[in-house]
């Protein structure tokens, strides 16, 4: 299971870390020894998934980089050349003061004919500033993702009764340091980003534990922490 493997690869420092598997979709949650099943949990769209060593991944599926990927593809179709992700990030940074925001969980963003037009329409419908440039569209998406991560963590704290002190991001999306920094700022929690190949590493870890190369999951995670560059973004 890709998410299950990715969560295993999180080099968390303690049991107060939120896990975020960041890719086309964002899977945000924690590991628990027991499932959490009150009606409020279902209403907030959190789920319990069985995991390694009879743990439960308690998580929520949130929009991830799909909106950014869609904008990139659309711009490529318009110009004949797809902009790079660093170019899109730079455009957003130039529009960093733009305050557009949408609800990334809205079904309108799942498969629109034009993601750019849909973002603009959603801002207009919500009475928010309407982006006019690529940078403003990108900044709107970044504002929205970081806000929705922050809202999900607040829900998570309410449902678990725990206060979390950091966020560990794994997967391809962990390379987007601008989103990582905005997430740190929105949540007021430090963000630790990496490793990128969480799913492959988690799968390998389980096999190596079984083969006796690692004593247990804690030992394997300690090795991940020492073996890969983990970048930190402190809240501002």
Roles of regions detected by a PLM:
Residues 1-166, 175-199, 205-235:
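Active-site core segments that coordinate phosphate-bearing ligands/cofactors
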Residues 172:
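Glycine-rich Rossmann-fold phosphate-binding loop(s) that bind the pyrophosphate
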């Amino acid at each position: 299971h890709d998410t299950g493997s990715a969560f295993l690869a999180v080099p968390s420092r303690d049991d107060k870390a939120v896990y975020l598997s960041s890719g086309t979709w964002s899977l945000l949650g924690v590991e628990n020894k027991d499932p959490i099943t009150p009606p409020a949990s279902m209403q907030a769209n959190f789920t319990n998934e069985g995991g390694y060593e009879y743990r439960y991944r308690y998580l929520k599926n949130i929009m991830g980089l799909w909106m950014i990927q869609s904008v990139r593809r659309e711009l490529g179709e318009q110009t004949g050349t797809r902009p790079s992700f660093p170019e899109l990030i730079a455009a957003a940074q130039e529009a960093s003061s733009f305050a557009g925001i949408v609800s990334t969980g809205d079904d309108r963003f799942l498969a629109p004919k034009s993601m750019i037009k849909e973002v603009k329409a959603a801002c207009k419908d919500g009475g928010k500033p309407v982006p006019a440039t690529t940078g403003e569209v990108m900044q709107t998406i970044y504002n929205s993702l970081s806000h929705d991560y922050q809202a999900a963590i607040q829900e998570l704290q309410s449902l678990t009764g725990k206060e979390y002190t950091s966020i560990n991001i794994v997967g391809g999306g962990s390379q987007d340091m601008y989103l990582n920094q905005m997430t740190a700022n929105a949540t007021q929690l430090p963000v630790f980003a990496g490793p990128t190949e969480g799913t492959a590493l988690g799968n390998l870890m389980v096999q190596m534990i079984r083969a006796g190369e690692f004593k247990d999951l804690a030992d394997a995670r300690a090795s991940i922490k020492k073996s890969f560059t983990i970048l930190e973004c402190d809240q501002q």
